[in-house]
């Protein structure tokens, strides 16, 4: 209940700042919008991870319960309109160490994946109805998280029925070719991300979508799907 109250206060203030910016300028800038990249529902089991304080600890059940209350408070209870848009991050199997996050390949068993790393995300998607999900920097089971058939197509949208938008972590799409070495360049990375359902990129990579279309690596239909 306390977490719900905290998130409600956050979204109250966020709404106020949003409307104030619109009245003053006619538009909003960074930190004046209604999309909140929170909560962080990664499981904190490695003390080397310097961002552990953002999470709710090592327990998947507790994390899911606390984060669900946060999402409901942030997004509000109107059946038609969102008060603000929450974002479940970082999807998935992202728990440090921070130094290796741009190139790390998380190898986990199916049991570890479903029992430890995914339950909080599932609860936010299927019960709290979180509006967005942020892909992690790392690879999971050899697939980059922001273009993972397993995580995005099969589980998130296939098993859980997620119908919100997927956003990359900032510069995660550049990691495809700079660190993970799974693509050749930015245009190739944009095509791969669109193919597996990353709708929004937090870096320059999606600026190369026209090049990817010209090459025949992606299609306008996939761009339209991301914009739906």
Q: Could you say what each language-model-derived stretch is?
A:
Residues 1-228:
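Glycoside hydrolase catalytic-domain context in secreted enzymes
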